[in-house]
């Protein structure tokens, strides 16, 4: 398949790059790339993949656009809030490059559909942020022989790697045979993220996809070496460090044929990724250990402990509340109040406050309750002028 006159004009500036050239462009045109997740990573990656001229670009995302996404998910706009993210992204991408076929898959990726979707593509970009989905993407891609470009970003840092390169490189399970404890996994809704940081990682993912598909890593003068790139946006200077990673694990349960335990049949019929990866159980209190925001509002001067991180507390908080971040509270064996004090505990959503109450009871503070729904519910039911972030 050759290029049209329009394509020569559109892609001319990258055609003359020595490392890329005409054959690189033709390879992109003949390739089908799937981006799982049209969020902070997926949006910039999609823009550059479509701009570069991949023949077919697929988008998997069942979520809808929220106004809190817009500072970093730059394909979406105020006008597309509440629209499916994959459809919102397609609207903008079609304007950017009408020569690219854009397919949308408005579903939650699952063992029931991952193989059917992935079989339509040649390379996968993992732009998700949950361990369960990362393992599913990895396992499906490995069993189909697909390369995965994997990225992530949180707060001011990001990382990037290429998995199962050319069906010979190490996979996600080679590096992480077992999932991390649920308590150690922080989503950007909890830990925060700066838009440019996640944007840089998404752009880097697109570049690696271009390099893989155009054949750069298969050149005689280039030897692919598994790597992990770590980006830091803060400090005196921005930094990007790249580390060589080990090759395939001889004990891997999916990419090593000799030790393979995970097959397509196992994934589609037996393996529950959400259960295997675990999930934080926040429903740890009895009904009488919880109160509504209306009940809290009825108290004249409650002893109110806000267990959010200090950065969040400084954004907005209820008057007369005391800030003791959950991580600090877990290491405390006493408070500056008598054990019989009635203590109300609040957080952002009503999850961490339950864990805090459980700890307080374990150190002797029996008269403590958490506030259901946290400050978010307070804004909805009590004070609509209280900011939600």
From Swiss-Prot:
Pathway: tRNA modification; 5-methoxycarbonylmethyl-2-thiouridine-tRNA biosynthesis; Cofactor biosynthesis; molybdopterin biosynthesis. It holds the Pfam family Rhodanese. It comes from the Eukaryota. The active site is at residues 188, 347. Gene3D superfamilies: NAD(P)-binding Rossmann-like Domain (3.40.50.720), Rhodanese-like domain (3.40.250.10). It catalyses: [molybdopterin-synthase sulfur-carrier protein]-C-terminal Gly-Gly + ATP + H(+) = [molybdopterin-synthase sulfur-carrier protein]-C-terminal Gly-Gly-AMP + diphosphate; [molybdopterin-synthase sulfur-carrier protein]-C-terminal Gly-Gly-AMP + S-sulfanyl-L-cysteinyl-[cysteine desulfurase] + AH2 = [molybdopterin-synthase sulfur-carrier protein]-C-terminal-Gly-aminoethanethioate + L-cysteinyl-[cysteine desulfurase] + A + AMP + 2 H(+). One of its GO terms (biological process) is tRNA wobble position uridine thiolation. ATP binds at residues 40, 61, 68-72, 85, 129-130. Its cofactor is Zn(2+). Its EC number is 2.7.7.80, 2.8.1.11. Residues 298-387 form the Rhodanese domain. Its main location: cytoplasm. GO terms for cellular component: cytosol. Keywords: ATP-binding, Cytoplasm, Metal-binding, Molybdenum cofactor biosynthesis, Multifunctional enzyme, Nucleotide-binding, Nucleotidyltransferase, Transferase, tRNA processing, Ubl conjugation pathway, Zinc. The keyword Metal-binding applies. Zn(2+) binds at residues 171, 174, 252, 255. GO terms for molecular function: adenylyltransferase activity; ATP binding; metal ion binding; thiosulfate-cyanide sulfurtransferase activity; URM1 activating enzyme activity. It is found in: Cytoplasm, Cytosol. Binds 1 zinc ion per subunit. It is an enzyme of class 2 (transferase). CDD domains: ThiF_MoeB_HesA_family. In the N-terminal section; belongs to the HesA/MoeB/ThiF family. UBA4 subfamily. HAMAP family: MOCS3_Uba4. Plays a central role in 2-thiolation of mcm(5)S(2)U at tRNA wobble positions of cytosolic tRNA(Lys), tRNA(Glu) and tRNA(Gln). Also essential during biosynthesis of the molybdenum cofactor. Acts by mediating the C-terminal thiocarboxylation of sulfur carriers URM1 and CNX5/MOCS2A. Its N-terminus first activates urm1 and mocs2a as acyl-adenylates (-COAMP), then the persulfide sulfur on the catalytic cysteine is transferred to URM1 and CNX5/MOCS2A to form thiocarboxylation (-COSH) of their C-terminus. This is Adenylyltransferase and sulfurtransferase uba4. It comes from Ogataea parapolymorpha (strain ATCC 26012 / BCRC 20466 / JCM 22074 / NRRL Y-7560 / DL-1) (Yeast). The gene is UBA4.
